[in-house]
From Swiss-Prot:
Key words, A-Z: Flavoprotein, FMN, Monooxygenase, NADP, Oxidoreductase
GO MF annotations in UniProt: alkanesulfonate monooxygenase activity; monooxygenase activity; uracil oxygenase activity
Organism: Escherichia coli (strain K12)
Protein name: Pyrimidine monooxygenase RutA
Family, per entry: Belongs to the NtaA/SnaA/DszA monooxygenase family. RutA subfamily.
Gene name in the database record: rutA
CDD domains linked to this entry: Alkanesulfonate_monoxygenase
Length: 382
C-alpha cells in the first residue's frame, strides 16, 4: 500500500453527479462491528450513541441508522449479546439533534405494522420530519424462537410476501390514516393512525437477494447493500447494477447505499497494522455461530446478506466492505465509490466510533471531491 494516494480529478458536471450522502451505522450492539478480542470492547448506551450522532451531525453526516438485534453470537466477546432497542433509541436521538436524518429498524415479525406506523408518526413529530423506517424480515431464527414467534422455516421463502403486505398497511396508515387491508398475513378492520407524519415517511431496506431487490424496487426509497472486499471500493458495482435494473422494471428511482468500515490512520502502513491486529484477535467461537446460522436459510439463494456476512474472507467485521489506509487513501476510495452508477450514498462504521467520526470529519471528508459541496464547519462539537 502507498501513502497519500493521488486524488481523482472530475469535471464540474461529474462533481455534481458524484455528490454522495454519508451516514453512520450507530453501534446499538456491544463492540460495534468488529468480532475481535483485539477491538475496542464496550457496551451500547444512549450516551455513547448520543455523542456519536451529535458528532456526525456536526460533521455534516446526512443520516444515522440503527439496526435491531435480539440475540447475539456469544463467544469470548459476547458479540451482540447486549443490545439497545432501535425505535426507542432513535426517538431519544431525534430529540437531541436538529438536522441529521434518523432511521430506526423494525423487526417486522415482532411488531404489528399499525404499531410501527404509530411509533414512526410519533418520532416524526419529535424530529420535525427527519425520521424514516428500515424494514427487515428477520434471518436469525434463534432471535424469534426464543420468544415463540418463529413462523417456521417456510418463512424463509415467503418473507418478502409477508413484508409486501406489511408495507402496504404502513403506506395506507401513513397516507390516509386508515387501513382496511386484507391479506394472507394481515387483516385491518377500519384501522386508524392519527396524527399522520408531517412529511412522506421514507422506507428503506437491505435486500441483496433477487426477491429483496424486487421488493426494494417496488416499495423502498433506497436500498442498502454490502461493500465487498478490503480496499476494493467498486467491487459492489454488480450489486448496484442489479438494484438499478430492478428499479427500472418498476419505473422508480431507488439508489444503493453501501456499507463500509473505515480504518484510517496517518499512513497506509499504520492503518494496515490496526486491521491486521483486529484480524489476529478474531473471536472464532462467535464467528462459528454466525456461520452456522447463515446455513439455515436454504431457500433464498446464495446472494443473501447473511451469506456474505459469514464468508470467511473477512468475517471479523461481517464482510462489510473495508477501507484501510491513510486519510488520503480512504478519501480517494470513497470518491471511487461515488463514481459507481446507482451508488447514492455510504453507510459507515468505524473501529472506534468517536475518534473515527472526528478523524473522518477533520481529515478525510475535506479531501473527498464527492463531498466538496459541504459548508464549512462553524463550531466545535461537544
Amino acid at each position: 500500500m502507498q501513502d497519500a494516494a493521488p486524488r481523482l480529478t472530475f469535471t464540474l458536471r461529474d462533481e455534481e453527479r458524484l455528490m454522495m450522502k454519508i451516514g453512520v451505522f450507530v453501534p446499538i450492539g456491544n463492540n460495534g462491528w468488529l468480532i475481535s478480542t483485539h477491538a475496542p470492547q464496550y457496551m451500547p448506551t444512549f450516551e455513547l450513541n448520543k455523542a456519536i450522532v451529535q458528532k456526525a451531525e456536526h460533521y455534516h453526516f446526512d443520516f444515522a441508522l440503527s439496526m435491531i438485534k435480539l440475540r447475539g453470537f456469544g463467544g469470548k466477546t459476547e458479540f451482540w449479546d447486549h443490545n439497545l432497542e432501535s425505535f426507542t433509541l432513535m426517538a431519544g436521538l431525534a430529540a437531541v439533534t436538529s438536522r441529521i436524518q434518523i432511521y430506526a429498524t423494525a423487526a417486522t415479525l415482532t411488531l404489528p405494522p399499525a404499531i410501527v406506523a404509530r411509533m414512526a408518526a410519533t418520532i416524526d413529530s419529535i424530529s420535525g420530519g427527519r425520521f424514516g423506517v428500515n424494514l427487515v424480515t428477520g434471518w436469525q431464527k434463534p432471535e424469534y424462537e426464543q420468544m415463540g414467534i418463529w413462523p417456521g422455516d417456510d418463512y424463509f421463502s415467503r418473507r418478502y410476501d409477508y413484508l409486501t403486505e406489511y408495507v402496504q398497511v404502513l403506506r395506507d396508515l401513513w397516507g390516509t390514516g386508515k387501513s382496511d387491508f386484507k391479506g394472507d398475513f394481515f387483516t385491518m378492520n377500519d384501522c386508524r393512525v392519527s396524527p399522520q407524519p408531517s412529511v412522506p415517511m421514507k422506507v428503506i431496506c437491505a435486500g441483496q437477494s433477487d426477491a429483496g431487490m424486487a421488493f426494494s424496487a417496488r416499495y423502498a426509497d433506497f436500498n442498502f447493500c454490502f461493500g465487498k472486499g478490503v480496499n476494493t471500493p467498486t467491487a459492489f458495482a454488480p450489486t448496484a447494477a442489479r438494484m438499478k435494473q430492478a428499479a427500472e422494471q418498476t419505473g422508480r428511482d431507488v439508489g444503493s447505499y453501501v456499507l463500509f468500515m473505515v480504518i484510517a490512520d496517518e499512513t497506509d502502513d499504520a492503518a494496515r497494522a490496526k486491521w491486521e491486529h483486529y484480524k489476529a484477535g478474531a473471536d472464532e467461537e462467535a464467528l462459528s455461530w454466525l456461520t452456522e446460522q447463515s446455513q439455515k436459510d436454504t431457500r433464498s439463494g446464495t446472494d443473501t446478506n447473511v451469506r456474505q456476512m459469514a464468508d470467511p474472507t473477512s468475517a471479523v467485521n461481517i464482510n462489510m466492505g473495508t477501507l484501510v489506509g491513510s486519510y488520503a487513501s480512504v478519501a480517494r476510495m470513497l470518491d471511487e465509490v461515488a463514481s459507481v452508477p446507482g451508488a447514492e450514498g455510504v453507510l459507515l462504521t468505524f473501529d472506534d466510533f468517536l475518534s473515527g467520526i472526528e478523524t473522518f470529519g477533520e481529515r478525510i471528508q475535506p479531501l473527498m471531491q464527492c463531498r466538496a459541496h459541504l459548508p464549512a464547519l462553524t463550531q466545535e462539537v461537544a
